[in-house]
Amino acid sequence: MKKLFFAVALALVSVAGSAQGLKANMDQSVKPGDDFWQYAVGGWLKANPLDKQHAQNGAFTDLEELNKKRINELIMMYADKKDLPQGSDGQKIGALYRLYMDSVGRNKRGYEPILPYLKQVRALKTREEVLKLMYEFDNLGFNTAPFGMGISLNPFKSSEVMMGVGHGGASLAQEYYSEPNESQQKVVEAIKSLNKDYLKMVGYNDAEAERMMQAEWAIEHKIGVKTLNQVAQRNPMLTIHIMTWEQLLKDFKGIDWVTYRDVMGYPTDIDTVNVSQLEPLHVVEDILANTSIDDLKAYMELHVIKAFSGYLSDTFTDRQFEAQKIISGVQEQKPRWKRAVNEISGSLGETVGKLYVKDYFPETSKQRVYRLVKDLQQAFEDRLKENTWMSEETKAKALEKLHAMYINVGYPDKWEDMEKFIDIRENENLIENAIRIGQEVRKATLRKYWRKPIDKTMMGCTPQTVNAFYNPMFNSINFPAAILQPPFFDPESDYASNYGAIGVVIGHEMSHGFDDQGCQFDKDGNLKNWWTAEDKTKYNERTKVLADWFSEQEAVPGLKVNGQKTLGENIGDNGGLKIAYRAYENRMKQEPLKKVEDFTPAQRFYLAYARVWASNATPEYIADCVNSDVHSPHRIRVSAALPMIDTWYDAFGIKKGDKMFVPAEQRAHVW
């Protein structure tokens, strides 16, 4: 049954992404040079309206839904088996599924699972008691301390780990606290309203809940307004402040680091730390010293509720969804089984991932995609060697970095096996299990990585993730199995379409190694300048063209893209398109293709690219993307990216007078 479902699902998606389905996806009443988005995917947009469960649809959503069905089938193999050995993969999956799906039990308990913790907060009398419990609850995963510590990589020697230190407390980006625009303010109000209702759900009257909500928000606002904005956070040098442990104790005396370290179970031999941002951490010191005890208790109570609200009764999850309706525009909550799949795939991601690739991503697929990645790598090398604006010195360093990139396809070469320490107990509730999982994973992480060399071949994501990633400190590109299927990668389509879809994704991730952030890391993943001053100036001039261009793009009426915030992703698309097209040209020399449905291979390349991003979305979702995401909205990743690409003009005969035409001298040429 499982294999049959797979074959049918694959065939259905394949039709949409194949060359034979091109015209069905299109709106040929529109000229490609006037509105390529509508021309390329207008038919698809009309045929695929949003359903109530999604704020955005499209290729990513389709694959995520397909994955949920597949993973659910895997889970069902263990859902009713209660006699499996404790600690076995099947026992963990089945037990966690049953705990999550027990709506009767969860609704009967209400907020009882967190009541003992709330009572502890309510009983606090002194500041010393508040801080002590704040640290202890942080160890349980309640995020009650407005700061934190955790194992991280040394940015200047990325094969070594160190302790990272930073502020907490701010759930939103800095812009939401400083000068929020209209759509950001709606998000703020939705969150504050949700927080107030949470407090009423645990027994407070309206006036008490209002006071406590405002107290918690005041603390969050004090921290959030002093954090770096989203553009500034893209500069690694602004988020790196390495100091000794002794210096941390001296510079931030308002935080009891030794007690916090010991409560959290971190090593006692910490010698250096990296503080991500200094100013907000000083704000935290002031908050801990000068905020009233009642307000600190309000902050803690709300964080106890919020940390695991998704594991409580339907009253909590339904109210949480009401806030999400305002934030994203989604109309209907996903059924419980889909939420269970998300929970299990998140908590037991590698355990599920092993089962997933066994059924849905054979070794032959891994090798086929790996060869495709190597083709793209060769195309990037060709373009770098032909680069006319870089000096030979910098070009040599760029080529070294490209050749040193580690490639992960489908699933990791070596599994991390961090989940073998996880113990799921059905005689405990979801929150008790979640607390123990968090603690066990933290301990296992320390055992595996503290004072030990880092294995940079690790993938850092699960095979069932529908996405792709570049890791600058590993200098690795990662393509999980779940994205390596139609319409991204289709074995039934010709290579022109595949290069325009998954080829651009691959080139995009490679380009991240040379975007405004990635270009600051060397071939070994260390933060180190490898540019001549003149070349870096030229680079900045070229990327500014891209940033300025995207800043002109209006996502929804009255709200434009921030070209500086999205620069890295836009460099990725710009480079990915050019690299993938070069790989397509290289292949054409060996295996020429003919027209299909009157479309040339070059046209099919760009139509496939547009198909990948085809999506309908609510205005709220698009606004949220512009406000809080480093990616441009899907439509703009087509309509603004392609006018920067010379070969797109050639493929469709686009010329001066067409609405999307940009003069050649005004186009961005980076990679």
Task: Show the residue positions of the predicted features.
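Active-site-surrounding "flap" and adjacent substrate/cofactor-binding loops of secreted or lumenal enzymes
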Residues: 31-34, 39-108
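Noncatalytic, helix-rich "gating/capping" subdomain that lines the substrate-entry/channel surface
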Residues: 78-371, 375
